[in-house]
Amino acid sequence: MWMIFSGLIVGGLLGFVMQRTRFCLTGGFRDMYVQKNNKMFYALLIAITIQSIGLLILTATDILQIPAHSFPILGTIIGSFIFGIGIVLAGGCATGTWYRAGEGLIGSWIALVLYAVTAAITKTGILKPVMDKINQPTNVNSDMSQTTGIPFWGLVVILTIITIFLVVRTLNNKKVRVAVPKLKQRYTGIRYYLFEKRYHPFIAAIVIGLIALLAWPMSASTGRNDGLGITTPSANLVHFLITGETKFIDWGVFLVLGIFIGSYIAARVSREFKWRLPDKITIRNSAIGGICMGFGASVAGGCSIGNGLVETATMTWQGWIALASMIVGVWTMSHFIFVRPMKKVHQQSAKVKQQTQIV
């Protein structure tokens, strides 16, 4: 009962907060390249930093132990790159797909189902030999503290200093802001703050970092010594639905179900829930994106949450290499979907303008 309750609570909080704050790593990584806007990436660093400080305290007081492990460096790079491509096509990362499904987006449902099914096939099905072939000969020590000689607390201090510097610089950057007309306020009191008010990404990141930290002791109390994770629980849910075997049900499964429920509640009460049927191109992209996400995250040993938020906070090479690789994947696909079409439009506009001047 505790496993069900704690998993749903943590997942519900995460889904609720992400839906209400529109916390989207896919959009953040894309904007770094397309719009030269790093704000969401810095928000991710805030969440990682908060979690890492909390883990430092929990491990120093022997409340929690983070076991060292090796990781497949080639698989992490290749898998994360493919995952990055997939999340652009799908319009959201693993967590983003779960919470957008809770908003009624059919495209996210398509991506979510294929993501979970592909992850299951890759981890235990016909694609497992492919994953093993990529990963087998490339295992190296993932512990940054052991490989660099810098203690865990030292790495946390370095990350904290870098994050504070970037956040302060961003907040002090006085850019000219375009006045955006505000909609009439619908709610008052706590309902306004929970279901209407929009929050700065940095505020959202603080809350998400605390939720990510809370996930560790909650998960450990059920025998799962890990933090937030999306891919394996999603695959386990598929296995359970197919086989009916309860061995696939653990804290992580209730976590992802909680994300969906929390997002649904937030979208319903804030009147943002709506069944939305995408066009044919979006359906195609969502399907391909979901498949890439499931395969890539399985090969890499984690998604934008498992690797990008959790493994980075534990100061592992797997986390930081995966994060860099998935960002490159996002940039690569963003170039073909957003940047190149925009360049063509600008070139055509310039050509028309030139012809007009000649006439």
What kind of region is each of these model predictions?
Residues 1-359:
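Membrane-interfacial helix-loop segments of redox and metal-homeostasis proteins
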